[in-house]
Amino acid sequence: MPLFATPFAQLDLVRQPEQDGEPLQAFDAADEYLLNQLHERGVTAQCRVLVLNDAFGALAASLAPHVQVTSSGDSHLGFLALRKNLARNGLDLGSVRFVPASETAVGPFDHVLVKVPKTLALLEEQLIRLHGQLAPGAQVVAAGMVKHLPRAAGDLLERYIGPMHASLAVKKARLLIAEAAERPQPRSPYPTRYRLEQPPLTLLNHANVFCREGLDIGTRAFLPHLPRSLGALRAADLGCGNGVLGIAYALLNPQAELTLVDESYMAVQSAREYWRAALGERPATFRADDGLAGQAAGSLDLVLCNPPFHQQQVVGDFLAWRMFLQARDALAAGGELWIVGNRHLGYHAKLKRLFRGVEQVAANPKFVILKAGK
């Protein structure tokens, strides 16, 4: 892989999770453009820089030796990538302060560098939280590859930060540059809520939760077929999102012990708050993690999963395959993985390579629900 070379550093970077023969870089031209623009403006060791949505740590690791860096994002995998890339390049792990997107990064900040996320609601929430955290004269610069940079991103900068102009495109990347100006205290529209008829629940969704405005069709297909009356099993909702699968299962199985895990901090926050609203003080474990990587081997009896098929703008089944491997390791003998997936993804064949037996529980023209026994 090529090195990431900018006026600040020359770094050897990897993506997270790592894959053998990884064809994709851990940085793009938008990262390079952001750092070149910041270098042209000039920074000192006293400059306070906030980096938002730094996918694999390219921006924060480049700046760490030169300024005071805070990094914030909604991906625990991104946090792990940052730590790995700092260590990989001989940089102090403490040189970058990391703040999960479920919390507010406290300034004041002189510069804010933003990689525009796929979910504009996340960008909006992040810009709202910058209110009161910017130093006088601060500049907020958002960047993305032109093909992934919506016009609405510039509108959000104008609304919440100040006057904005777009740069020329360089290597198919563009900057949106906003100068901080007086703005009234904004009111966040997040979290959002919607009502589920069966089971009768009101779902809570922070800004970056998948299908924030309504239940996704895969989960809708899965819910009527959740296992029930299984007793005190140790169950996990893997990639839990707002926690709807785990909470619906918990309602059907009052003795079950639940763990809800997602790599999104906002998803875990949503699941925790939703659980308390639906189930009160019933104990459960909530964790932002790299799937079940932190789960002890053989410590679960059941895993429920609606696996993702994309990481940022990259589409593929590598994350689902990794989740299946993690579930197999975390399940005790006789335990089961239950999943929902698009028919065309061929999960049945993949699961047969990992599990003792695979059965179809239900299907419709678009989705299939499978259970795989260890």
Language-model features and meaning:
Residues 124-136, 321-333:
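A short glycine-rich, Lys/Arg-flanked "PGG" loop and its adjoining helix->strand segment in the class I
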